[in-house]
Amino acid sequence: MRGGENRPPARVQSSSEELELRHQSLDAFPGRRLPGRGIQPAAKMSSVGKVTQVPNGKAYQQIFQAEVQLVHSLAATRKRAAERSVTLKSGRIPMMKKVETPEGEVMSPRQQKWMHSLPNDWIMENPVLHREKERAKREKARESENTIAAREVRGLMDTIVPEKISTSTFQRQAEHKRKSYESALASFQEEIAQVGKEMEPLIVDTGGLFLKKLTESDEEMNRLFLKVENDTNLEDYTIQALLELWDKVAGRLLLRKQEIKELDEALHSLEFSRTDKLKSVLKKYAEVIEKTSYLMRPEVYRLINEEAMVMNYALLGNRKALAQLFVNLMESTLQQELDSRHRWQGLVDTWKALKKEALLQSFSEFMASESIHTPPAVTKELEVMLKTQNVLQQRRLKHLCTICDLLPPSYSKTQLTEWHSSLNSLNKELDTYHVDCMMRIRLLYEKTWQECLMHVQNCKKQLLDWKAFTEEEAETLVNQFFFQMVGALQGKVEEDLELLDKSFETLADQTEWQSSHLFKYFQEVVQLWEAHQSELLVQELELEKRMEQHRQKHSLESQVQEAHLDRLLDQLRQQSDKETLAFHLEKVKDYLKNMKSRYECFHTLLTKEVMEYPAIMLKELNSYSSALSQYFFVREIFEQNLAGEVIFKFRQPEAHEKPSQKRVKKLRKKQGSKEDMTRSEESISSGTSTARSVEEVEEENDQEMESFITEEVLGQQKKSPLHAKMDESKEGSIQGLEEMQVEREGSLNPSLNEENVKGQGEKKEESEEEDEKEEEEEEEKLEEEKEEKEAQEEQESLSVGEEEDKEEGLEEIYYEDMESFTISSGNTYFVFVPLEEEHCRKSHSTFSAMFINDTSSAKFIEQVTIPSRLILEIKKQLRAGFFEHLEKWFDQCSLNTRVTVATKINELDSELELHLHLHQPRAQQIEKDIHNVRAAELLLHQEQLDSHCAGVTETLKKKRLMFCQFQEEQNVRSKNFRLKIYDMEHIFLNATRSQKLVTLSNTLHQELLSYVDVTQVSLRSFRQYLEESLGKLRYSNIEFIKHCRLFSEGGNFSPKEINSLCSRLEKEAARIELVESVIMLNMEKLENEYLDQANDVINKFESKFHNLSVDLIFIEKIQRLLTNLQVKIKCQVAKSNSQTNGLNFSLQQLQNKIKTCQESRGEKTTVTTEELLSFVQTWKEKLSQRIQYLNCSLDRVSMTELVFTNTILKDQEEDSDILTSSEALEEEAKLDVVTPESFTQLSRVGKPLIEDPAVDVIRKLLQLPNTKWPTHHCDKDPSQTGRGAWACGSRGSSEAGAGGAVCSPPVLCSCPGPSSPKGFKRHRCQPENSGKKAVPSASATSAGSFTPHPKPNKMERKYRVLGDKPPPAAEDFKGIILTLLWESSENLLTVAEEFYRKEKRPVTRPDCMCDTFDQCAENISKKILEYQSQANKYHNSCLIELRIQIRRFEELLPQVCWLVMENFKEHHWKKFFTSVKEIRGQFEEQQKRLEKRKDKNAQKLHLNLGHPVHFQEMESLHLSEEERQEELDSMIRMNKEKLEECTRRNGQVFITNLATFTEKFLLQLDEVVTIDDVQVARMEPPKQKLSMLIRRKLAGLSLKEESEKPLIERGSRKWPGIKPTEVTIQNKILLQPTSSISTTKTTLGHLAAVEARDAVYLKYLASFEEELKRIQDDCTSQIKEAQRWKDSWKQSLHTIQGLYV
């Protein structure tokens, strides 16, 4: 080892590792302090334990053994001390961790585990043991060596070792130590050499494996490059493939770097393992050499230190070699990476050139594709347009043909307007469709252009996406090639679309003209029909008017006749006897015959007017037929005569029509010659392909039109019978169709030729047309002149015989120029065709159509053109339809006229018959309705007069009978009044109040007055009734006369009848006056008799009663005093109950708040800390008031109890006589008890006063010992406590007070009326005799009650049951009750003394009063003592309930503590979150500002900045961005520091506030009253069954009831403060525990407050850690984001600068 043969590889060791090695080696040899070093051994050994070698022969063996024993004893002592010391299983300090408390539990599982574990349990972590250990270490460190040594010596055993002598022991030991040292040193050298042998193969194997991997990596990279370079399809590669190639190469290079790092780490780990092995060997042999005891410990350390130094030099050399190897390998790897990058860049350049050529070729193919030149969408749209045109054209043509359905008689102006609007809408729809189609085609082409531009942009984007071309190169390539191709194609398409759009506009104008022309044509002919209809209607109205005039004249004459007849009938009705009635009846019958003859003359006149109507209608029909033939240029005029025979008249062309006819003939001849020439030229020269195609299209269109017309004609024939025989007129119409076709071909051929020249011949065509028109006009003039000359010559040369031949020639010419048509009746009509053609030509001369400009668009124009032949055919159908309707209309009108005439004649006959029928029975009706009715009226008048007189007589009899009944009623009322006065005697005797006697006395006079008033009112009312009824009877006579009206007044009486009626009614009025005077005299006599009888009864009754009021006044005073006492006691009970209810309500409200807070955790409706604390303070105030009122606190003595005790002890002997004398009364009271609860049950309405509960009290106070009265008991629960009974009384009093608004205040003490139950029954059974028997019974009772008694004195001791002096003033319940009882007792005795001091007099109410003062005072004392006993019971029950409330509040207090602490924590956390939010908001605003600067810098960065010219601009931009990045870095760092500082500051504030708040809260809880602070109530032990007691006895349990156990151990306590944790120490928010808190009490609230404080503290620390972690994470992400932007910015700058290198 020292020679270096087996030296391990050199390894460099740092100073820190060297110190660590030395320290570990020193720790392996504990003992003394090494000289010259500052290292303190782990344990110290005093000089006593030092082992030294003594020369042989100079010491006894006994001394040596003693020293050895001393050393062993000292070691054992130290071992025991070490065993007794506390050693934690884990070296870490137990931490308080944040553990969530399960819902519904107070402690977490960890805390429960601590609570259930045993003391000093090694399984559980124990902070106390750790604290004790640390304390022991600190105390031990403070002790000096001498002190330790002295303590150790004192702990040695006092043993004696026998004396022995030995001389060879030290030599043998020394030899043994030397051999052991040499063998250990040899083993040490061997193990060092073995370590070197073991490590060498591992290093060699690691290096060989690395070289193998390096070779494989080079071969793999070369293979990847060769694969791409040798591939002929390089252009098929994508940029991703090339990037993947570089990624693979880079991955290999990265893997090589990783392998180099792994090699370095593996070699270093081998060196570290070598070091560890060497350390273990050094430690091991340091102990072994030390155990041999051959060398001193310092020498052993020195030896080991030298060996370690040599090893450290070797290890440092090894580390240096490994570092150099790592640098060399990394340099070679970087060089290889640069070469590979250059090689890969060459491949990318080649790939870019290939891609550019491929992109140009693909775009050329794209532009040359069919989808661009003829887009499928446009082709499809054109096909759809053709189909839609065909559909719309068919609809329009079909609608044009429907005009034939509007012919009369089904014609209406509304239908025609609808037809025209529908046609216009169809035309507009087609025009709109053309516009929309053109728009859609343009949009489709626009999409195509957009597609081309998109393709251009895609190509550009593709170039940029490949990252092989710059943006300028891409722009140049796009502008030079792509945009030019797209622009050329777009211009060509736009020109074609413009031509098609113009053609559609021209077509729309032509269609509009055709539609308006057809509508105007039909409208003109329909106007003839409407004029004819209106004329027919006028003639019909004229007829009606003439007939109405005759009727009005006849009506006036009839009115005059009827007026004269009415006068005759009035005379007939007003006759007074039968003879005059018969004469006037005959006169009326003669006048009726004259009226009948006048009706017959009127009928003859109207019949003549009706028969002239058919001739007028026929004249109007012929006029309509003539107008129709003239409009349609028809020669024949259809007419009829009155017999219905048909007559045809022929008309000649009019003067203004002849020149037009000649002009049309010449024009037709000229057109025929031109057509022949054109056809010959076309046959010679076959024409151009364009003309042929147009002719073919025209022929196809003509064929389609012909087929369509044929279909429509057939359809019209099916619809209407008008076309049944149209086949006959086809020959004439075919010629017209052919002529129109020739004209159309002639007009189309020039336009087709001009189309080939592309519009250059348009001007030439216009000039040619003008020339032709001028030539035609000149030729027409010349021909007219020639014709005139020829005509004159012919006229001169022709003779009279030749005129007939001339007419025949003219007819032949006319037939040649005419067209015929035959209708369904077989009649044939001829039409002047030249005139009609001239009319059409003039209308069409202003329109010229030149709209076909291109062969491609010709099919779209021809598809929607309306053929002229169709218009002409529709006109012919309309003409035939009108003439068909004309013939039928003649027949229909003739028939209608005949029907109308016949109807009118029948109506006139019926009218005459009706008049005669109505006139015939008038004579009989007059005789029956007027003559006979007047006769019956005379008889009825006499009967009514007799009936009225009989009614008056009957009414007078009824009034006499009613007076008799009224007299009997007054007698009964007088009798009832007397009985009522007699019955009031019973009320006087039973009255319980003096005021009631006074009231009864006043009632007598009131009853008298009321009786007199009733009597007078009844007499007055009957007198008034009699006057009114007799007045009505008189008025009935007057009314009867008024109802008898004369004929002049609208009645049916004559003057003679009125005179007889008046004489009869005067006799009846005299009879009424006589009856009224008799009844009035009798009523005055009755009134005087009734008043005298009532006054006599009242005067006799008033003198009977006098002494009842005196006794009642005394009873009322006693009643009033007792009532006041009860009311005052009940007021105190109500006050006590209100305090109890207030405490219960507060507890319930507290429980509800707790429940609400627990259920709404996290919502806005949570209860705050201040609310809960203020609520607890309110409870404390209410509880203190309650305790003060009940005087139940243990820390003060109740003055009331002292007074009670003193009074009872003082008066116990003096009151013995009173108690002895009242034993009989107590026994009787047991049988019939009156409780205070019964006072609340007031006497109900309708029950006797004797049943009032207060009467029982008066009976007990005032009754004699031997009297027994039935009492009224209130229903109550026998188990009801004293407090419950008094509470019932208080509620009763409150209810009585509430009812005071309706009735008078309740009187709680009154006496019964009857003297005995039997008497009470007798009075009820015999009410009439009660007044007579009441006075004798009262006098009999009072006669037996006169007994002599001594004068009363209330100051005697036996009456002073509550003491002579009044109790002191008190505010508690018992003191107040005692004061009330004493004062009431004094007042009652005073009243009784005053009453019984008066002179002797009879007692009128012995059932309610006592005879002597002694009896009355004894009953008063007994009742006062009963009240006092009940008050004590009620006070005891209040104490029981108060303790229950205090206990319940203490059970709710822990929940309040937890909620308060949670709210405290949430409040602080919200404040902290607000602060953090403000800091982050400021940071975000600054960050947005810097982001805007970043965006501006990024926008400024473009490719041109890389040019050397823009170097300064580039540099300033770079500096600006670096400044912004530095500002962002500093801002992120400052934001992190601010957030962390804010978090720590808030955490420190929270802990401080939490400690302060807990201390204040615990001190406030000291003030909470517990059940231990309140007196214990006296409770009688409940009675238990004997079987239950036997079982408890057998079970060994106590037979006594267990006393109430406290909720927790009471007493003062010291609560620990908040302890610091690792988190608080690291963040320096809490380094030392807070001060402990001392309280004078220990309640559940104290425990809950401390537990809640600790839980909240842990939760806050957890949130604190999460917030710090969040701040750190946010800062890290922000730094990473900033760093990514920095790298991207640098890369962009490098790329831009590299473009111009």
Swiss-Prot record:
Residue ranges annotated as compositionally biased, kind Polar residues, are 683-692
Q: Which residues form a coiled coil?
A: 171-198, 757-804
Family annotation (InterPro entries): DUF4455 (IPR028089), DUF4456 (IPR027914)
User: Cellular component per GO?
Assistant: extracellular exosome
Q: In which residue ranges is the amino acid composition biased (Basic residues)?
A: 661-671
Q: Where is the composition biased (Acidic residues)?
A: 696-705, 767-808
Residue spans with biased composition (Basic and acidic residues)? Answer: 672-682, 755-766
Ranges for the region named Disordered are 1-35, 657-808, 1272-1291, 1319-1354
Pfam family for this entry, one: DUF4456
Superkingdom in the source lineage: Eukaryota
Q: What keywords is this UniProt entry annotated with?
A: Coiled coil
PANTHER family the UniProt entry points to: COILED-COIL DOMAIN-CONTAINING PROTEIN 180 (PTHR21444:SF14)
Q: Output this protein's name.
A: Coiled-coil domain-containing protein 180
Which gene produces this protein?
CCDC180
